[in-house]
Amino acid sequence: MTDVDLDAEQYEKNREAGEILAQVRNEAADRVEVGASHLEVAEWAEERIRELGGEPAFPVNISIDEEAAHATPGVDDSTTFGEDMVNLDIGVHVDGWLADTAVTVDLSGNPELAEASEAALEAALDTVEAGVETGEIGAVIEETIDGYGFNPVVNLTGHGLGHWQQHTPPNIPNRAVDQGIELEAGDVVAIEPFATDGG
């Protein structure tokens, strides 16, 4: 699946982007609280990325409750956080080499939903290695989320990351599938489990 043979310098840029992203994700999540502004959190995260030496790979996404993913506050957005389930999705690039992550912040009083997604991510990461099929990763995600009494969101998937490309093959499902693509050494992927208490 690797379109480009990544050399050591390119791997280092992916790693640097990931390190910046991990720090910004955690710091931005701490800013998500009832009454805080969606736009201010997004703008703060994007500026923090730049302070640390990266660039935003895409506008910060702040999605609420059943929205699940891909909502971005507009320039005039005055929305504030309430007692919500918040998905904060952030990307960083260093010279076009991307890292992409999300974190769920529970302001709703239902922490089990966020815990199910986090546990599914950890289980999936334990599965990833060269030669594993994406369907196997999906099966681990589904089994973990099911174990919490929730359902995986099946119309959203993880994905590959390329040079200046946010979504590349392979797709990484959030459920078991019979057909999958075998991961190769050098593939860079974002694994994105989503759990729901709906269908």
Feature-to-residue mapping (PLM):
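Active-site neighborhoods and metal-handling regions in enzymes and metal-associated proteins
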Residues: 1-199
